[in-house]
Amino acid sequence: MLAFIGGTGLTRMDDLEIRHRHDIETRYGKPSAPVAEGELNGVPVLFLARHGDPHVWLPHQVNYRANMQALKDAGTTAIVAVNAVGGITAPAGALVLPEQIIDYTWGRDSTLFDDPNDPLVHVDFSWPFDPVLR
């Protein structure tokens, strides 16, 4: 199932008909907000407000691991994440689909596989964005 993660400026999707909100507890704690399950133009989707609903979590306070685990537990197979960021040359309001990434997520846990009983997993990060979703 496709999931959307909304960032600052997108704590809700106006056309999403919410059928259920899942309060999910993960081994990493609670996600930023309940996972909303519903339909968007007749397509079943999930939605999670990255900073909470209402917006209460600053970027360094977001429990990213709990967010990802909650979406997985709810049946997510693909994620489209929406972010508000500054730019260098694109005009304000431009939609940008990134091809590569600079990872500035230092200073926080960087894996979902931290239990000694977890499988040994190496993620190929050379092309971090799914070409089908792009």
Ranges and model annotations:
Residues 1-127:
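Metabolite-binding pocket within alpha/beta catalytic cores that recognizes anionic/polar moieties
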Residues 126-134:
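Active-site rim beta-loop-alpha module in soluble metabolic enzymes
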